[in-house]
């Protein structure tokens, strides 16, 4: 379950922070993470996280998601990114902190010849505590009328959905996408975090 990931996450985080605790950047990252942990106690709904580049947004948003999931018994975390290059990078960070089995990548760069049948099925159903996927895959799971795309829709209920670099959504899709995430928050028990990085 998602709450089983909290101890491994903090074990690895303390190890990483102990090496950087005296640097100004290390102190800033720790403060941002602690602010996110405090926000995780607030009731499910919409949240925003704007952090300067290099400020630890990825791990801070994950700390929020894990703590919020535990506090409100949410079932999984979806980390939604606009580009496959940063998906692979973020998934590698998550695996380093949570282990390989806890993280599911789902995007177009995955090689179906390398993936096992179990991995393909997990990707089709989003059957994992932490799913890292593209905006395209995420919104297709909501809007598509194909059974294969809709198969993972039920996995969105009672989840923390982190929309990283949310401002990259094309303007012409903004209204329906915002309506969809409002629906997820209002009627599916989701929490949505809109993340962006500001330039330092």
Question: How should each PLM-predicted stretch be described?
Answer:
Residues 1-200:
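N-terminal helicase ATP-binding lobe
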């Amino acid at each position: 379950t998602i709450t089983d990931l909290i101890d491994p996450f903090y074990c690895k985080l303390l190890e990483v922070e102990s090496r950087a605790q005296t640097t100004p950047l290390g102190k800033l990252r720790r403060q941002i993470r602690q602010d996110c942990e405090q926000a995780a106690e607030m009731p499910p709904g919409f949240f925003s996280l704007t952090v300067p580049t290099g400020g630890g947004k990825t791990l801070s948003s994950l700390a929020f998601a894990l703590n919020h999931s535990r506090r409100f018994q949410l079932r999984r975390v979806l980390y939604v990114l606009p580009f496959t290059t940063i998906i692979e990078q973020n998934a590698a960070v998550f695996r380093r902190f949570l282990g390989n089995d806890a993280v599911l990548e789902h995007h177009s760069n995955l090689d179906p010849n390398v993936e096992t049948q179990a991995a393909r099925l997990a990707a089709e159903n989003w059957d994992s505590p932490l799913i890292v996927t593209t905006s395209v895959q995420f919104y297709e799971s909501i809007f598509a009328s194909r059974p294969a795309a809709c198969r993972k829709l039920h996995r969105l209920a009672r989840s923390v959905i982190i929309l990283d670099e949310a401002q990259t959504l094309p303007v012409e899709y903004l209204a329906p996408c915002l309506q969809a995430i409002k629906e997820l928050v209002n009627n599916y028990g989701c929490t949505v975090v809109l993340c962006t990085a500001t330039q330092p």
